[in-house]
């Protein structure tokens, strides 16, 4: 399996995606389901497929993704990051193109923690003058 599969790990928010690429027909499975079935929203599917579309490899690879943690948006972003890393593992000459589009860089934004004495991370209690 290691010889023919290229892999990459992607992260976004609290989601982690392990991606495996193999030369094939363009079938994408996420956690054992088809990508259309797993991601309900069309925008999430588009986000996940962006690196393959950019490099014109949408029909060239079979992609198998294991993703856990976070929500739909984070999982789609993690899948995109993982596919990008797997493509670079397959062909390093794709890195400048993917980097120019901003897919190689890990989006480091995380949820800010809730502080004591506040409603949420920054929301204060309502001030009453009287």
Curated annotation (Swiss-Prot):
One example of a Gene Ontology biological process annotation: translation
UniProt keyword list: Ribonucleoprotein, Ribosomal protein
Keyword tRNA processing: no
SUPFAM superfamilies on file: Ribosomal protein S5 domain 2-like
Keyword Ribosomal protein part of the UniProt annotation: yes
InterPro entries listed in its UniProt record: Ribosomal_Su5_D2-typ_SF, Ribosomal_uS9, Ribosomal_uS9_bac/plastid, Ribosomal_uS9_CS, Ribsml_uS5_D2-typ_fold_subgr
MF term (GO), any: structural constituent of ribosome
Coiled-coil residue spans: none
Any GO CC annotation of this UniProt entry: cytosolic small ribosomal subunit
HAMAP family: Ribosomal_uS9_B (MF_00532_B)
PANTHER family on file: RIBOSOMAL PROTEIN S9, SMALL RIBOSOMAL SUBUNIT PROTEIN US9M
Similarity-based family: Belongs to the universal ribosomal protein uS9 family.
Protein known as: Small ribosomal subunit protein uS9
Organism: Variovorax paradoxus (strain S110)
Lineage of the organism: Bacteria, Pseudomonadati, Pseudomonadota, Betaproteobacteria, Burkholderiales
């Amino acid at each position: 399996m290691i010889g023919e599969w290229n892999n990459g790990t992607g992260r976004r928010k609290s989601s982690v995606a392990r991606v495996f690429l193999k030369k094939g027909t363009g079938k994408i499975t996420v956690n054992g389901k088809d990508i259309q079935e797993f991601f309900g929203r069309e925008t999430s599917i588009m986000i996940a497929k962006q690196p393959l579309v950019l490099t014109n490899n949408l029909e060239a690879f079979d992609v198998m993704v294991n993703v856990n943690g976070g929500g739909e948006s984070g999982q789609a972003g993690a899948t995109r990051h993982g596919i990008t890393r797997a493509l670079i593992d397959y062909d390093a000459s794709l890195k400048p193109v993917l980097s120019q589009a901003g897919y190689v860089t890990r989006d480091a934004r995380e949820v800010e923690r809730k502080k004591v004495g506040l409603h949420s991370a920054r929301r204060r209690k309502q001030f009453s003058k009287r």
